[in-house]
């Protein structure tokens, strides 16, 4: 989108409605038909980014499979989503700084990750930690690897990725 491209090029602090309109090839006034101001536009954008991430976790998810297989699917979904969407990967830190982004993330209840954690904890498989901490110890490794792989020449063969998936899974087990 125009917002993603502008953010990647200039950073979220340098965005203006005029620059976004130019990037989108529309008149500046047109944007104001949809958004009162830059903050509202960025908040809606933050909702969109988070919704895309939630949809990524859901892709090909099958809760009838063993918990590790469910976890592997979510990890791979994140990995491949970030490989296919390098602009999102480039903008991750900026997304986190968007107005209300943290609140948007916290206010989403019953998301796939939370449900997975509750069910796996109930089954006695996962450590009794918050969903946020479990995420940082596990699925966040996919995000960190994808981000660092852009700058460091990792040899990320499928067997290495599988090893990372298994090790990050063990990190959150009881």
Each predicted region: which residue ranges?
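Amphipathic alpha-helical segments used for helix-helix packing
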Residues: 76-100, 144-151
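Hydrophobic/aromatic residues within well-ordered alpha-helical segments
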Residues: 38, 45, 49, 53, ...
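C-terminal alpha-helix
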Residues: 116, 167-174
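Solvent-exposed, amphipathic alpha-helical segments
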Residues: 2-9, 52-60, 137-148
């Amino acid at each position: 989108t125009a917002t993603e491209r502008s953010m990647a090029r200039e950073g979220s602090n340098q965005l203006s409605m005029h620059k976004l309109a130019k990037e989108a090839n529309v008149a500046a006034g047109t944007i104001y038909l949809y958004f009162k101001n830059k903050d509202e536009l960025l908040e809606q954008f933050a909702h969109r980014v988070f919704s895309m991430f939630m949809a990524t976790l859901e892709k090909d998810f099958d809760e009838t499979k063993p918990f590790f297989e469910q976890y592997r699917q979510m990890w791979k979904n994140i990995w491949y989503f970030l490989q296919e969407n390098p602009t999102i990967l480039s903008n991750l830190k900026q997304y986190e700084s968007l107005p209300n982004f943290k609140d948007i993330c916290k206010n989403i209840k019953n998301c796939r990750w939370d449900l997975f954690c509750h069910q796996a904890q109930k089954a006695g498989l996962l450590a009794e930690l918050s969903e946020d901490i479990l995420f940082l110890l596990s699925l966040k490794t996919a995000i960190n690897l994808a981000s660092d792989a852009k700058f460091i020449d990792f040899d990320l063969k499928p067997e290495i990725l599988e090893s990372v998936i298994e090790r990050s899974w063990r990190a959150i087990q009881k």
